[in-house]
Amino acid sequence: AKLRESMRFEIKEIQRNLGITVVYVTHDQTEAMAMSDRVFLINRGVVQQKGTPEEIYRQPVNQFVADFLGKVDFIKGEAGGGRILLHHTEVSLPYAGDKTGAVEVAIRPENITMSKETGDIEGTVTAGYYLGDAGDYRVAVGGISLRVITEGRVFREFTPGDKVFLSLEDFIVYDDDGSLEEQLKINT
């Protein structure tokens, strides 16, 4: 694994020094993100999205792309009246889009802040795993489970059974057919 990681840097440096185009085909998400200036994400022979690694990660055009790159929770909801009510919860998110009716909300776990004191959404920690540089948690919110990633140094602050409060930094709204409806930034 360490050799593979160091080779990423070496290949990228050679490409940059020579000023050449390199086509690199991989199923490894980390390699694709780390080594690419441009990514073409293909599913069944059809380009789903092309762009910089950051564009594709932060603004995935459909649920396939969002799910393929990184970790994400998809939650069904109902849009209307400037809000999205998440199914199986009491959670209502602000929504400025025009869509009404069925939607699916995509939330990346690193875009959730978890606290014991304050936040917009109340939940209960059901599991937590120490990963060294990160804590990987599952938090029950009503009838759904959200994944939350924290810095490793705060891992011991939260244990299963703890009541916690979550705040979302941003989320993505998809139409019920899986296509991008809107990306929303919260508290920015």
Feature roles, as predicted:
Residues 46, 52, 67, 71, ...:
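Gly/Ser/Thr-rich helix-start
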Residues 1-64:
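ABC ATPase nucleotide-binding domains
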Residues 29, 52, 61, 71, ...:
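A generic "binding-loop/recognition-motif" signal
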Residues 58-80, 106, 167:
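C-terminal boundary and immediately downstream tail of ABC-type ATPase nucleotide-binding domains
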Residues 72, 83-188:
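Non-catalytic connector elements of ABC transporters
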